[in-house]
From Swiss-Prot:
Belongs to the ATPase B chain family. One of its GO terms (molecular function) is proton-transporting ATPase activity, rotational mechanism. This is ATP synthase subunit b. Keywords: ATP synthesis, Cell inner membrane, Cell membrane, CF(0), Hydrogen ion transport, Ion transport, Membrane, Transmembrane, Transmembrane helix, Transport. Pfam families: ATP-synt_B. It is found in: Cell inner membrane. GO terms for cellular component: plasma membrane; proton-transporting ATP synthase complex. HAMAP family: ATP_synth_b_bprime. F-type ATPases have 2 components, F(1) - the catalytic core - and F(0) - the membrane proton channel. F(1) has five subunits: alpha(3), beta(3), gamma(1), delta(1), epsilon(1). F(0) has three main subunits: a(1), b(2) and c(10-14). The alpha and beta chains form an alternating ring which encloses part of the gamma chain. F(1) is attached to F(0) by a central stalk formed by the gamma and epsilon chains, while a peripheral stalk is formed by the delta and b chains.
């Protein structure tokens, strides 16, 4: 026996322990470490994906807000254009109505002038006829001043 207490059993146990550690390292620790590294990578990828999702969500929210603003602006523009077109149509209709009214008034005035001239011609003819009749009556009989005045008054009354 050795004074240190190293014997063959201890060496065999030591070699067996080293082989066991080598086998555990090769078949257990390596795959376990790989599984842990894969899990760590998956967790990191998941966190990165969550962060990207957050950023994409913020970007989508920003785009949605921008689209809503653009839609409101477009709606306001459409409303303004519709109001402007409505004013234009109203003014155009008023202008056409004014032109039509002016045309009708001018036509009515022309018709009134024609009717007035026709009435004047008729009256002129009647006055001439009355004067001729009155003159014939005066010439056919002798009249005194009173009869003359009566005839003139009757002629004026007929006018």
């Amino acid at each position: 026996m050795n004074p240190v207490g190293i014997n063959g059993t201890l060496i065999v146990q030591l070699v067996t322990f080293v082989i066991l550690v080598a086998l555990l390292y090769k078949y257990m620790y390596g795959p376990l470490r790989k599984v842990m590294d894969d899990r760590r990578a998956k967790i990191a990828d998941g966190l990165a994906a969550a962060e990207r999702g957050k950023e994409e969500m913020a970007l989508a929210q920003k785009r949605a807000t921008e689209l809503v603003r653009e839609a409101k602006d477009k709606a306001a523009e459409i409303i303004a254009n519709a109001e402007r077109r409505g004013v234009e149509l109203r003014e155009e209709a008023q202008g056409k109505a004014r032109e039509e009214a002016d045309r009708i008034i001018a036509s009515a005035r022309a018709e009134i002038d024609v009717e007035t001239n026709r009435a004047r011609e008729v009256l002129r003819g009647q006055v001439v006829e009355l004067v001729v009749n009155g003159t014939q009556r005066i010439l056919h009989r002798e009249i005194d001043d009173q009869t003359h005045r009566d005839i003139i008054d009757r002629m004026v009354g007929q006018l």
